[in-house]
Amino acid sequence: MSSAQLLTAQQLAARLSEPDLLVLDCRFALEDPSYGARVYQENHIPGAHFADLERDLSAPVRKGVTGRHPLPDPAELALKLQAWGLRQDSQVVLYDDGPGAFAARAWWLLHWLGKRDGVYLLDGGLAAWKAAGLALTNGESSLRPGDFQGQPDASLLIDAATLQAQLGQPGLALLDARAQPRFRGEVEPIDPVAGHIPGAQCAAFTDNLGSDGRFLPPEQLHQRFSALLRGRPVDELVAYCGSGVTACHNLFALSLAGFPLPRLYAGSWSEWITDPRRPVATGD
């Protein structure tokens, strides 16, 4: 069974009282890093704990070395997950405002640490919860420490040097989750260099969603990624984006479609461009 699973707002509402349920609010805004904590204090799904992208789901940036959202230290992340109440047998539901990129980053981190069963994204995110007229609260969520012990799986990652050595190999499928204008290098609102890694294809993460903001059916996602793979093996696929966040949305969608989980270049574009010797491409 795929490790990527979805819950509807109504399904989550029916399970909120279950004692083994852990809900994490992953809301964030790249242009306003304090946004997530602020809106969590205003209202959130009852019982949810707040997981901040920069404070909890990333390590500190090392200027000129890392990308904008380096992977967190696995031992530190495991301790935070324990503090929120994660146990080995917990059911976990992750949400953000709706597109799911920040929730997908949390999903990938849990998968990386070995928590692969019973982890769900709220399909449509908080927007779907609100649209269903379900309750929100601004109250404190109770803490009951968990016993989760995670071990990172290095096979899920590829580093910059290894990726650079593989550029140009016919089997490599390199998928960039950013939107077309950033991929082509026409605009770059965040990073100091525009463009993409040579040989990459644009696979905008938003194309995993329907017009209602929910994930496309697995069959449609399978067609999408099969077309992008062009017959290449999925174990040669590498996902990246601007900083290792929206790429996780593509990885979740790949898993939802029934593909085995390929590798993530976690440093992504913002790390790639820290070394001017690495090649850069623009256009299609």
From Swiss-Prot:
Subcellular location: Cytoplasm
PROSITE patterns: RHODANESE_3 (PS50206)
GO molecular function annotations of the record: 3-mercaptopyruvate sulfurtransferase activity; thiosulfate-cyanide sulfurtransferase activity
Enzyme class: transferase
Keyword flag Cytoplasm: yes
Entry text on domains: The N-terminal region is the non-catalytic domain; the C-terminus contains the active-site cysteine residue and the CGSGVTA motif probably responsible for substrate specificity. Contains two rhodanese domains with different primary structures but with near identical secondary structure conformations suggesting a common evolutionary origin. Only the C-terminal rhodanese domain contains the catalytic cysteine residue.
Known function: Catalyzes the transfer of sulfur from 3-mercaptopyruvate to a thiol-containing acceptor to form an intramolecular disulfide releasing hydrogen sulfide and pyruvate.
Name of protein: Probable 3-mercaptopyruvate sulfurtransferase
Organism: Pseudomonas aeruginosa (strain ATCC 15692 / DSM 22644 / CIP 104116 / JCM 14847 / LMG 12228 / 1C / PRS 101 / PAO1)
